[in-house]
From Swiss-Prot:
PANTHER family: PEPTIDE DEFORMYLASE. This is Peptide deformylase. It catalyses: N-terminal N-formyl-L-methionyl-[peptide] + H2O = N-terminal L-methionyl-[peptide] + formate. Signal peptide: none annotated. Fe cation binds at C96, H138, H142. Removes the formyl group from the N-terminal Met of newly synthesized proteins. Requires at least a dipeptide for an efficient rate of reaction. N-terminal L-methionine is a prerequisite for activity but the enzyme has broad specificity at other positions. Gene3D superfamilies: Peptide deformylase (3.90.45.10). One of its GO terms (biological process) is translation. The gene is def. The lineage of its organism: Bacteria, Pseudomonadati, Thermodesulfobacteriota, Desulfobacteria, Desulfobacterales. Its cofactor is Fe(2+). GO terms for molecular function: metal ion binding; peptide deformylase activity. Belongs to the polypeptide deformylase family. It is an enzyme of class 3 (hydrolase). Binds 1 Fe(2+) ion.
């Protein structure tokens, strides 16, 4: 296993939809292991393959069901898609490993149903609410070429983009 570099905004790959995975092979299993190590090292709740520079529709996540419960353990979703949404909620103080040092309130669905396959190719259907629903929406957004800053007000988004541009210019 190896720690992978996390790609950060404004890297172009983060703005492009990911390719669907057709075969689960040894390389993909290695990628899952490396992404897992990277997720826990970061630390984060979820990590999409695109966030480590890999153009594949896959994500890993580990979310406790609520504040009082332990981790549910690592889960892998390949080619996930949201097939049902319900209700509205604001994800307060949402952040992202690919958008460092910035947090914002983000409009999300309160409940989602997600379908995909696991790392063994078995079909998976997840009915999620609360934090899990937010994490799944956030990570699936990555696979569709969207960042959470694409879902906030244009004023807040432009302030962040200016700050990043200024920092990049200062780095030379």
């Amino acid at each position: 296993m190896a720690l992978l570099d996390i790609v950060t905004y404004p890297a172009p790959i983060l703005g492009k939809p990911c390719k669907l995975i057709e075969d689960i092979d040894e390389d993909l299993v290695c990628l899952v292991e490396d992404m897992t190590e990277t997720l826990y090292d970061a630390p984060g709740l979820g990590l999409a393959a695109v966030q480590v520079g890999v153009d594949k529709a896959m994500l890993v996540y580990d979310v406790a069901e609520d504040e009082n419960s332990e981790s549910t353990g690592l889960k892998v979703l390949i080619n996930p898609k949201i097939v049902h949404t319900e209700g509205k909620v604001t994800s307060e103080n949402e952040g992202c490993l690919s958008v460092p040092e910035f947090r914002a309130d983000v409009p999300r669905f309160a409940c989602v149903t997600v379908e995909g396959v696991d790392h063994e190719g078995k079909p998976v259907k997840i009915d999620a609410e609360g934090l899990l629903a937010i994490v799944l929406q956030h990570e699936i957004d990555h696979l569709e070429g969207k960042l959470f800053i694409d879902r906030i007000s244009s004023l807040k988004r432009s302030m962040y983009k200016r700050r990043v541009a200024k920092a990049l210019k200062a780095e030379g």
